A protein has these predicted regions:
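C-terminal and inter-domain tail/linker signature
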Residues: 1-123
Length: 123
């Protein structure tokens, strides 16, 4: 049975809350995510910015899609984009569209200001 738009939005809200500010263990990620690309992305970002946060400013749902507008916050503690750890706190705006299937995130499309993040790391 597929989720309603409201239920899909609630699922993404729970996902963001569960993963933000703590270690993203495989068990935790697998609970919410069936998209292998997103799971790999989470692992890569977690390695560079342990316990990073995704803060949703807006969540909009329609059908099986949920759009999130918000911000990434983290502390640079591992290599990222060829940059050695700096210990700097960084933030950058982002937008993600999630497709929900079988009560999990099945696909995602990420729009992220990587230039803003790299600029903060190089200052």
């Amino acid at each position: 049975m597929s989720l309603t738009s409201t239920e899909s939005k609630q699922l993404v809200g729970r996902y963001l809350q569960a993963l933000s500010g703590q270690s993203k263990t495989p068990e935790l990620v697998d609970h919410f995510v069936s998209d292998a690309g997103l799971a790999a992305h989470i692992r890569d970002v977690e390695a560079a910015f342990p316990e990073y946060e995704l803060i949703a400013e807006t969540l909009i749902a329609e059908g099986d899609l949920v759009a999130m507008h918000g911000a990434f916050h983290g502390v640079h503690r591992g290599p990222f984009a060829g940059i050695a750890p700096t210990g700097r706190s960084v933030s950058a705006p982002l937008m993600i569209i999630y497709r929900i299937a079988n009560e999990r995130i099945a696909e995602h499309w990420l729009h992220f200001d990587g230039t803003a993040l790299v600029t903060q790391l190089q200052q």
